[in-house]
Amino acid sequence: SWGTIENCSVSGSVSGTVYVGGVVGAQIGGSITGCSSSATVKGTVDVGGVAGQTNSSATLTACYATGNVTIEINPAKNIAGGSLVGMNAGSSLLACYATGNVTSTGSSTGYMHIGGFLGNNYTTVTAGYWKNNHEQGIGYNRESTGATKVDGTDVTWQKAVDAMNTALQNAGS
């Protein structure tokens, strides 16, 4: 998509090969705001609970994913997968969270970047949270990030919600 996706909710299951996401496969520019996905998502390259990939000037704001993500690894492919976004290379990610587990099957001779929140990250993340089967939130990170695991002790869901709301207010969203 190159457009605007707002206030949507997706359930069920989604499967594919490349650019597989609960809401959108690839968001190239435009924005995704206020969307959620409880869908189970299965794919091979760039796989995520909300978006398989964000790119160019795409923004992701106030979104969340609760469905499980399965990455079926192709031995000859580079792999990026996360509970929220597989490959995050848009212009910003603000106040989003993910709770679905991320699992993978197989092995690859290419890179395998799998995280509890994002597979690959190439942009600024502000107030991003995850809680699932992964200790590492981002498989490969090229930018500073505000991605934090909710552990229930130091970081509770209440603290996470408060921080996401504050970030949205500060951004004027």
Outline where the language-model segments fall:
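Predominantly extracellular beta-rich ligand-binding scaffolds that present long acidic/polar faces
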Residues: S1-S173
